[in-house]
Each structure stands twice: as C-alpha cells, then as structure tokens.
Amino acid sequence: MPNYLKFKKEFFIYISVFLLILTISILIFFFLRNQKIIITTTEQEYINGQDLKLEIKNSFLDREYCFSSCYPYFLERENGTWQPYSYIECPFSDEVSGCIEPGELSAFLVSLPLVNVGKHRISVPVCEDCSLGQSFHETGRIFSNEFEIK
C-alpha cells in the first residue's frame, strides 16, 4: 500500500507541474498575441480635401517603430485590390524622422489631397528598432482601418 500512495503522490505532483506549465504557456501566448501596433483614423468618412487625424498605438513592451522622412505614409484606394496613389521620387535621402516608443500613443494630421471618392486606407512603412537620423529601411508595413472619401 505505501508504494501505491507514493505513486499517487508523484502522479499528482507531475500533473500539477504539467498544468502549471500549460497555464503559464497559455497566458504568455494570449499576452504576446495582443501586442501590436495599430493605426486608426478618428472618422469613418471624410470629405475630399479634408484633414484626416491618425492615431498610432504601439502596444509592444519591447519594440520601437520608426518612420520615413520621405514618405511616412501612403494613401491607398481599393479598386478590386488595394492600390497606392502615385508619388514622386523622394528628392532627398530617406532617413528615420520619428519613432513611437513601446506603449506610446501618438497622433498626427494628414492633409488629404483631392482624390477619387471611394474606400481608402493609409499604409505606413516602418523600421523596427531603428534610430533617428539613421538611413530608413522598411522592415514592415502597417495599415489603418478602411475609411470612405466622399
């Protein structure tokens, strides 16, 4: 009988450790999954030529994201697929002009040019963990919510 109790106790300890590790793994997975950088517009509809306010939230705890000095954003229109408007080539060297720190919320105004009416979004090229003044190299792209221009 003592061997049976010893086995039962060891089995209980192994199951407890397994469940503890499983619980911690699930919590870490859900925590890491919720870390992201989000770009949203304050309105769902804009009038052609109106200023658009963008809010950028970096919910990562350990990643800084930086933006281009040439083209910090691109306006895209949905026409079956998402297509950016044509932009002239940048006349100066493309450097990192600003960054959003981990946990930071930032906002800025975008002056919308006169463009086609329809569904649009903002595309923002980012450089992860770059430094101000450094040459910008795109490591990712983040998209805003969709909005309508009338």
Specify the residue positions occupied by each region the protein language model found.
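Short, solvent-exposed, Trp/other aromatic-anchored flexible loops in extracytoplasmic proteins
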Residues: 87-119, 127-130
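The feature marks short-to-medium sequence segments in extracytoplasmic or secretory-pathway proteins
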Residues: 61-104
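Hydrophobic alpha-helical membrane-insertion segments, chiefly the h-region
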Residues: 21-31
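Surface-exposed, proline-enriched loop/turn segments that connect beta strands in immunoglobulin-like
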Residues: 39-43
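Terminal connector regions
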Residues: 114-150
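Short, solvent-exposed loop/linker segments at the N-terminal edge
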Residues: 44-49
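Asparagine-centered strand-capping/turn motif at beta-strand->loop junctions
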Residues: 54-61
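N-terminal Sec-pathway targeting helices
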Residues: 4-21
